[in-house]
């Protein structure tokens, strides 16, 4: 009997540690996914020491100019207010000391905020709508996300180049994903795992309970027991 496509990968998991503790989502995973999200999470990682940082200091760390750093910090504060419903910003600013967290985020809130940031990106919305067949026209997508059609075109063209390296194409006009089914499934598996690592179930049209039961049957068939992280990856 042929083994499932992902059987060879279920014994490995992505691990990232910073300062001796596990970090759910590293900016390293995001270099090829979304530039703005990459810099935002890189900046969030910079505040894990709970210290004050000036825009100039942060600019050296993330290799941006100070103005861009300030822009991303302001955007993060707005993102946090939208995510949490709170009125205070994510960061507090001191003329001399620079920036620091207004309130320390607990680990659960931190993870949920990262998930919110990922799901809020145009790249994720594009990936979601195309692979789950909710993308109808460029105009409809642009209207749905309050962007211009030219911005939508630019995002799709950037993504097309990345997909081509996996042998996946987007059909002209309809933007339906084309390629070997196993490759498309593997691409979705890798992408969703790197972005969420089992923290949420991103497959809206698939019953999570059915997949859990299927994973149990697979483990029983191969007579293996996996820890929760590896089991979640198998389910993905």
Where are these regions (language model features)?
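Ala/Thr-enriched low-complexity intrinsically disordered regions
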Residues: 8-13
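A cross-family "folded-core" feature that marks the main globular domain of proteins
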Residues: 6, 18, 22-236
């Amino acid at each position: 009997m042929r083994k499932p496509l992902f059987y060879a990968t279920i014994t490995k998991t992505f691990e990232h540690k910073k300062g001796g503790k596990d970090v759910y989502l590293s900016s390293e995973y995001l270099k090829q996914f979304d530039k703005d999200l990459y810099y935002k999470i890189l900046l969030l990682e910079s505040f894990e020491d709970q210290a004050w940082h000036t825009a100039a200091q942060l600019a050296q760390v993330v290799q941006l100019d100070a103005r861009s750093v300030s822009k991303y910090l302001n955007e993060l504060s707005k993102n946090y207010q939208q995510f949490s419903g709170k009125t205070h910003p994510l960061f507090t600013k001191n003329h001399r000391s620079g920036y620091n967290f207004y309130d320390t985020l607990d680990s659960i809130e931190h993870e949920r905020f990262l998930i919110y940031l990922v799901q809020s990106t145009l790249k994720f919305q594009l990936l979601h709508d195309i692979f789950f067949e909710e993308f109808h026209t460029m105009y409809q997508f642009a209207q749905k996300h309050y962007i211009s059609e030219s911005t939508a075109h630019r995002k799709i063209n950037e993504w097309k180049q990345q997909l081509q390296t996996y042998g996946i194409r987007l059909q002209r006009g309809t933007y339906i994903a084309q390629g070997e089914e196993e490759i498309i499934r593997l691409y979705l598996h890798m992408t969703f795992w790197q972005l969420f690592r089992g923290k949420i179930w991103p497959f809206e049209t698939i019953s999570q309970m059915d997949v859990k039961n299927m994973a149990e049957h697979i483990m029983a068939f191969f007579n293996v027991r996996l820890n929760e992280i590896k089991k979640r990856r198998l389910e993905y």
